[in-house]
Amino acid sequence: MANIIKAIRGMNDCSPTDSPLWQWIEDKVRNVLASYGYSEVRMPIVESTPLFARAIGEVTDVVSKEMYTFWDNDEQLTLRPEGTAGCVRAAIENGWIYNNEQRLWYMGPMFRHERPQKGRYRQFHQAGVEIFGIANPEIDAELIILTARLWKELGIEQHVSLQLNSIGSLAARAGYRTALVAFLENHQALMSDEEKERLLKNPLRILDTKNEALQEVLNDAPKLLDYLDDESRQHFTQLCALLDNMGVQYEINPKLVRGLDYYNKTVFEWVTSALGAQGTVCGGGRYDGLVEQLGGHATQGVGFAMGLERLVLLVQEVNKNISVPNAVDIYVVFSGEGTTLAAFQTAEKIRSELPHLRVMTHCSGGKFQKQFKRADKLGAKLALVIGESEVQTDRVVVKDLSGAVEQQTISVVELIDYLKRVF
C-alpha cells in the first residue's frame, strides 16, 4: 500500500460532522452583517508581496516571519495573511471608494507560518469588515455594537469582553515611542532576545508581551493615552460615551496596540478566558492613512476581523444548547420493482415544493432495515418508505425516526401538505 499523503501541519480538514456548526456560525455572521446593510466582496487569496510589506509594516512579525511567499517568474507573491490590505487594494483598484462611503465584508482563508496549537493554525478563516469614507466615531461604535449583537446570536455574549484603547495619530505615537523606549532601556535584563529586537524595531509591540516579569514592569510604564493628540482624544471620548449610552460594557486597556502598523486612533479586541492562550476572538480599529499609503486618495478606514476557528471552539465550549440543523431532514428509502423511479420523483417533488428541506435518496440498495439505520445515522427526522405496494396505490409510508409519532401511510397527493405541517 502506498504511503498516505497527509494534510500540511496546521492546515486542517473540516469533516461532514463539523461542517454544520461552521455553516451555522457563518450564516449567523452573514445575517447580522446583512441586517446592517453591509455588502460582501471577494478578493484573491494570493496578492503581490509588497502590498503586505507596505500595509502591515516590514518590521511586524507577520511580514518578517510568518508569510507564505514564493516567486512566480519575476514576481514575488504571498498567500494573504490577513484581509484588510487586499480589501483596500481592491477598493482602490476598482474605484469602490472614490468620493463614496462603503461598508464591506468578506469571509475566507488566511495563511501564516506560525507554530500550530489550539486556536492558532497556519491556514485559518476570518470574517472581516472594512468601512471606508467615514471619519466620525459613530461608525467605530457601530462596528462594536454589531459584534456585540453577533455574540448574542451565537450564545457567547457572557463569555467575551471588550477591550478598548486609542493609539492616537502617527505623530502622537512617535512621542510616546520615545518615552517608552527610554523607560524600557532600563529593564533589558528582563527581556528575551526577541523582545530586545522589538525594542529596537517596534517597541509598542512589547506592550502585549507574555513575559510576566516584563508585564509587571509595564504597569509603571508611560501610558499611550497620556500622549494622545487632541483630535484622537476627542474621538475616543465620544466613542466611549456612545458605547456607555448603548449599554456596551468595555475595559480601557492602555497596553492594547494590535500587531499591525496601519492602525491609528481606535483599536479594540473582544477576548475570552475560555480558550486559554488564544483568547482574542475579534480585533480591529481605525486605519485612516492606509488607503493613501497604498496609492489611493486620502480616505478614512475602520474595520475588524474575527477568527472563525476560535468562534467554533468557543461556541462548542460554552453554548451547550446550540441546535445545529442536521444534514438531512427527510430520507427516502425504497425497495422492489418499479420503486426507483417513484422514489426519485417523490424526492424531486419535495425539493421543488419545499426547497428549504434537505432531502436525500438512498442509492446503495439493501433491505429497509439497513436503509433506516443510514437515515438514523444522518439524523433525519422522517423516512419516506416506497415499496411495490406503495407504487401500485400511489402512496408513501411516513416513518417518524424518533418514534414520537406512529408510522402512517398517505397518498402522494397529500404528501406536501403533510410535510408543511411537520416542518
Swiss-Prot record:
The alphabetical list of record keywords is: Aminoacyl-tRNA synthetase, ATP-binding, Cytoplasm, Ligase, Nucleotide-binding, Protein biosynthesis
GO MF, any single term: histidine-tRNA ligase activity
| Segment forming the signal sequence | none
Task: Reply yes or no: does the keyword Protein biosynthesis apply.
Answer: yes
The name of this protein is: Histidine--tRNA ligase
Localization per Swiss-Prot or TrEMBL: Cytoplasm
Q: Which InterPro entries match?
A: aa-tRNA-synth_II, aa-tRNA-synth_II/BPL/LPL, Anticodon-bd, Anticodon-bd_dom_sf, His-tRNA-ligase, HisRS-like_core, HisRS/HisZ, HisRS_anticodon
Q: What class of enzyme is it?
A: ligase
Q: What reactions does this protein catalyze?
A: tRNA(His) + L-histidine + ATP = L-histidyl-tRNA(His) + AMP + diphosphate + H(+)
The family note in this entry says: Belongs to the class-II aminoacyl-tRNA synthetase family.
Kindly indicate whether the keyword Signal belongs to this entry. no
* BP-aspect Gene Ontology terms: histidyl-tRNA aminoacylation
Q: Which HAMAP family match?
A: His_tRNA_synth
GO CC aspect terms: cytoplasm
Name the EC number(s): 6.1.1.21
* Complex and partners: Homodimer.
